[in-house]
Amino acid sequence: MMRLLLKSLQFLYNIYAMVLFVAIMLLIFPFVILSSLAGRIKGGNMILRLCMFWSDIWFPLVFIRIKRKYESPHDKSKQYIFVTNHISYLDSAVLVKAYRQPIRPLGKVEMGKIPVFGFIYKKAIVSVDRSSLENRIASLRILRSILSKGISVLVFPEGTFNMTNEPLKDFYDGAFRLALETHTPIKPVLFLDTYDRMNHKTLFSLNPGRCRIVYLDEIPVTDLKMPDAPFLKKRVYDLMEKKLIEYNASWIQPARRLNKKNVIY
């Protein structure tokens, strides 16, 4: 009986959260349309700020607490290629809380097909169809152009949801080759709790609680060249994997997780 009651309450909570999600989106939508007239760069930055405004309203109203931890000082005025683990539908919403600076995420082209949200999505991100080599090349060309304007980019190097019990899936090469080509430092960032707040199995798994964001040490690329891309990818992967285990990320198989007394943060 109690289990049925809890499931009913979670269902009602999810309906409430989705109604708020859409209502706030519709509230900012006219301003998104106006901002889009300002062009890819200026207009995109304006739309990003509107998305930040959306997130600043939505997260408190659905009782999700964003907590940030900086393992090293983070300079918001500096340009980075951010790389983040991808474990939940909620990652897309959390990223506008995580990155409070001009930035363009690389995202799936399929999300742009959703009414209203898709329009905002396409104006705020660089879309990629990973099934098309031509489209992947075009997306990297756009990212290079954005970096040349002094704007940071965000890449989920796993490409798709990590549906395993491992800390991370294998990384694609694109972010690391782009970093070497443009001499842009990499900043790894961890989303520790988005899986717990809303796992990848269903959109109706959202629940309130904390959502931790951890900013790891910057990884410079000034002394590296293009043949070093595999080394750079492994260095970033190893660091993120190590930290996810240290922070006891909940999706990791028990044998690889730390004892509670050794968990940090």
Segments from the language model and where they lie:
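Glycine-rich helix-loop-beta junction characteristic of Rossmann-like nucleotide cofactor-binding loops
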Residues: Y70-D75
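Transmembrane alpha-helices and immediately adjacent membrane-cytoplasm interface residues
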Residues: D56-I66
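Generic preference for hydrophobic
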Residues: R68, F82, P105, I213-Y215
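A hydrophobic membrane-anchoring feature enriched in long, contiguous, low-charge segments
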Residues: L4, S8-L37
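Hydrophobic packing residues in well-ordered alpha-helices of helical domains and bundles
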Residues: L5-S8, L12, M46-C51, A229
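Catalytic core of membrane glycerolipid acyltransferases/transacylases, capturing the structured
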Residues: M25, V32-R49, F53, L61, ...
